[in-house]
């Protein structure tokens, strides 16, 4: 089924069935005649994968494996308690948001929403008529996903196109940000609803990670939209430069290290 334009990346077992007995996580050692498995398959386009491999090789490195971002982020941020639950993980990046549902620590659903933090920045730049770099600075320093979190007395000084100075009230900045963040959360929910069923029935908790999760109030906005417990996920169990590495923005990178470490060494 993955001939042509698609290449299989992951075949992740969810549960096994032995002679009709369901809900088996590990059938090794069991006696039976018929073994069935429910598998979550993840594929990607051969063209983008070829470009990725070429970029790694041109950097003088050897590519051992490819891991989807949603799986890597889950390996980094989910707690032992969450690995026993059904959790919706949203990795809000710059250009996209990776959506994943983990059941009992296993990836049961994955999708990509083609929106991320850069789209929020673009909205700010367009509506305030400021350069993209200035919009990113303002978003990171003063942005909030909910207007009620912004200081109503705070007026921000912004550098407009052509070098002119402008002003914007902090709550107005949040009102620019909120619609796009709502859209990202809505599309993520839609992908789960259409595949697994109603989110509030299927999921126990929501974990936000990625650079977009650093936007103040994103967890509160998600709690309002989903009606579920929400937390911001940081990489677990890291040491060394923890003030740098233990950030939602580095969840996928930490997860990739763990994914690579879990793979058998090649002879």
Regions found by a protein language model. Name each.
Residues 1-89, 107-108, 128-177, 195-198, ...:
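Nucleotide/phosphate-binding catalytic cleft detector across ATP-hydrolyzing
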Residues 44, 143-146, 200-225:
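Glycine-rich phosphate-binding loops at beta-strand->alpha-helix junctions
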Residues 56, 91, 124, 188, ...:
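Residue-level signature of catalytic and energy-coupling elements of molecular machines
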Residues 89-96, 102-105, 114-118, 209-213:
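A short acidic Gly-Thr/Ser loop motif
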Residues 92-100, 223-235:
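Acidic-glycine-rich active-site phosphate/pyrophosphate-binding loop
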Residues 114-135:
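A conserved active-site cap/scaffold subdomain adjacent to cofactor or substrate pockets
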Residues 122, 171, 175, 179-186, ...:
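Feature representing long, continuous alpha-helical segments
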Residues 185, 189-204:
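Phosphate/pyrophosphate-binding loops at sites that engage ATP/ADP/AMP, CoA/4′-phosphopantetheine
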